[in-house]
Amino acid sequence: MVRIAIAGAAGRMGRNLVKAAHHNSEASVGAGSERPESSLVGVDVGELCGEGRFDVALVDDLSKAVEEFDVIVDFTAPVSTLANIELCKRHGKKLIIGTTGFSEEEKLVIDAASKEMAIVMAPNYSVGVNLVFKLLEKAAKVMGDYCDVEIVEAHHRHKVDAPSGTAIGMGEAIAGAMGNELNDVAVWSREGITGERTKDEIGFATIRAGDIIGEHTAMFADIGERVEITHKATDRMTFANGAIKAAVWLNDKPAGFYTMTDVLGLNDL
């Protein structure tokens, strides 16, 4: 049984992660944390999520419950995730990172940490999205040289980063399959007189509205036809279940940097 700590357990995603861990036969909820200023600190994590009493009180710092978990699942914010990396390094814990919006420098910190600890990091933990990444690699190898590639993503009004980590992951899959670095070919937005698009660019468009959980479309557009590969999430539990699956998988792995491709065994597709 893998004992899991949920960072940000009182948030929308955090509560779903608690539920997913509780209902996974190979996992249990060992700890949950929330910001120190939260009025929910001290509340039972299970009761908070409507799952009954777990006898696990929400703490303001996971270091206070370090003996109660094996793996942290973190879908919070970069500064909090980086702090949890240091905690994991000190205490021999493992980490699932679902946080997005890291700077390039912060990504280097995560990569360096993976030499000392086991990390799974993915822009999206749903099985469907990770299959889409593989499909995009295949499509890019066939159509990328002659099609215009555009990525459109939509999320709820509360999402604070753009484009989404999943959209960036889609772009990285396409660019990598074509032998490019995404930062060299990405056009993150367009406004005003932009001139004609260049052959290699990958365009991004972002929508923020209402309660959209997450919708992503990659478009390969040629003259006379267009191929679109789309994923639509209708319930956050799909992300939560995937993250807990990753935590169970990671528990017996050595130090290293892993992705959902590793967790799901998609490397040979």
From Swiss-Prot:
It is found in: Cytoplasm. This is 4-hydroxy-tetrahydrodipicolinate reductase. Gene3D superfamilies: Dihydrodipicolinate Reductase, domain 2 (3.30.360.10), NAD(P)-binding Rossmann-like Domain (3.40.50.720). The lineage of its organism: Bacteria, Pseudomonadati, Pseudomonadota, Gammaproteobacteria, Vibrionales. The keyword Oxidoreductase applies. Coiled coil: none annotated. Catalyzes the conversion of 4-hydroxy-tetrahydrodipicolinate (HTPA) to tetrahydrodipicolinate. Its EC number is 1.17.1.8. InterPro entries: DapB_C (IPR022663), DapB_N (IPR000846), DapB_N_CS (IPR022664), DHDPR_bac (IPR023940), NAD(P)-bd_dom_sf (IPR036291). GO terms for cellular component: cytosol. Keywords: Amino-acid biosynthesis, Cytoplasm, Diaminopimelate biosynthesis, Lysine biosynthesis, NAD, NADP, Oxidoreductase. It comes from the Bacteria. Belongs to the DapB family. One of its GO terms (biological process) is diaminopimelate biosynthetic process. NAD(+) binds at residues 8-13, 34, 98-100, 122-125. It catalyses: (S)-2,3,4,5-tetrahydrodipicolinate + NAD(+) + H2O = (2S,4S)-4-hydroxy-2,3,4,5-tetrahydrodipicolinate + NADH + H(+); (S)-2,3,4,5-tetrahydrodipicolinate + NADP(+) + H2O = (2S,4S)-4-hydroxy-2,3,4,5-tetrahydrodipicolinate + NADPH + H(+). SUPFAM superfamilies: Glyceraldehyde-3-phosphate dehydrogenase-like, C-terminal domain, NAD(P)-binding Rossmann-fold domains. NADP(+) binds at residue 35. The keyword NADP applies. The active site is at 155 (proton donor/acceptor), 159 (proton donor). Pathway: Amino-acid biosynthesis; L-lysine biosynthesis via DAP pathway; (S)-tetrahydrodipicolinate from L-aspartate: step 4/4. (S)-2,3,4,5-tetrahydrodipicolinate binds at residues 156, 165-166.
